Amino acid sequence: MKKKLTRKEKREAEKQINFFEEFLKIRKHFFCNFNQKLKSVNEVRHSSYITYEPDILLFTIIMKNVSGIHSMNKMTKDFNNDTVINNFSKVLGYNDLEEIPHYDTINNFLKKLPISELEKIRIYMIKALMRKRCLEKYRLLDKYWCIDIDGTQIELTSENLLV
């Protein structure tokens, strides 16, 4: 029987994990077209206001969540160093990335971005996992897909939750 980790031991173990490296392994194995999907987001911003492409903005917020950073302000502070900027540049294929976007820039972008654009990325990811049969062990009686329904919402956010 495995020894249950204490909360302190769990925190210490998490310090040893390189979340960025782990994310890159997962992305490479399961989502080989992930960067292209981020680049293909149709945005509504006026071209004269664009400093950062959609893939940079979306990748930054994804890495915030992957890294376990809970606030946008902390993300801006933690990511504002040359190592992070160089890593983002390499992963996204940019040679001229000098700064990571400020959290206000990301928030403004996300406010204007149609939800359907994010749904396209989510659908791509779910389909990729299903194609690789990663979700097979979660079938009911090895035959049926289970669907979780959360009935706590007050409003419907989308007509097409998953196509």
List the model feature ranges, each with a label:
Residues N107-V163:
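Active-site-proximal, Lys/Arg-enriched surface segment
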Residues M1-N35:
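Charged, often Cys/His-bearing segments associated with DNA-binding zinc-finger transcription factors
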Residues A13-E14, P101-H102, K132-E136:
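Alpha-helix boundary/capping detector
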Residues I50-Y124, A128:
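Short, positively charged, Gly/Tyr-enriched micro-motifs
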Residues N33-E43, G68, S89-D96, R133:
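Glycine-centered secondary-structure boundary/capping sites
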Residues L24-F59, M63, N107:
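Basic, short loop/linker segments at the boundary and entry of helix-turn-helix/winged-helix-like folds
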Residues M1-K8, V44-E53, G93:
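Short N-terminal helix-initiation segments at or just after the protein's N-terminus
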Residues Q36, E98, T152-I154:
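Flexible, active-site-adjacent loop/turn segments at secondary-structure boundaries
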